[in-house]
Amino acid sequence: MSKEEAIEVEGTVIEPLPNAMFRVELENGHVVLAHISGKMRKYFIKILPGDKVTVELSPYDLTRGRITYRAK
């Protein structure tokens, strides 16, 4: 059984939360809870409110995601 493909969407960080979690507003208006991917943690990439980010969403739970990229 293979994993389902993740859905990649663009969004804007609204507010930081404890434990490297962020509330992100997607381009379609939905608000999701997202955490930082492991590589971003490893290389200490900082994310601030207002940053444009790419979020991966699981097809099973569209309310939570993983931040995989921060736009410059």
UniProtKB/Swiss-Prot annotation:
GO CC annotations, alphabetized: cytosol
Main subcellular location of this protein, as a coarse class: cytoplasm
Domain of life: Bacteria
The entry's keywords: Cytoplasm, Initiation factor, Protein biosynthesis, RNA-binding, rRNA-binding
Domain S1-like: 1-72
Keyword Magnesium recorded: no
GO molecular function: ribosome binding; rRNA binding; translation initiation factor activity
Family per record: Belongs to the IF-1 family.
Function according to Swiss-Prot or TrEMBL: One of the essential components for the initiation of protein synthesis. Stabilizes the binding of IF-2 and IF-3 on the 30S subunit to which N-formylmethionyl-tRNA(fMet) subsequently binds. Helps modulate mRNA selection, yielding the 30S pre-initiation complex (PIC). Upon addition of the 50S ribosomal subunit IF-1, IF-2 and IF-3 are released leaving the mature 70S translation initiation complex.
Listed PANTHER family: TRANSLATION INITIATION FACTOR IF-1, CHLOROPLASTIC
Protein name (Swiss-Prot/TrEMBL): Translation initiation factor IF-1
Organism whose genome encodes this protein: Geobacter sulfurreducens (strain ATCC 51573 / DSM 12127 / PCA)
Lineage per the UniProt record: Bacteria, Pseudomonadati, Thermodesulfobacteriota, Desulfuromonadia, Geobacterales
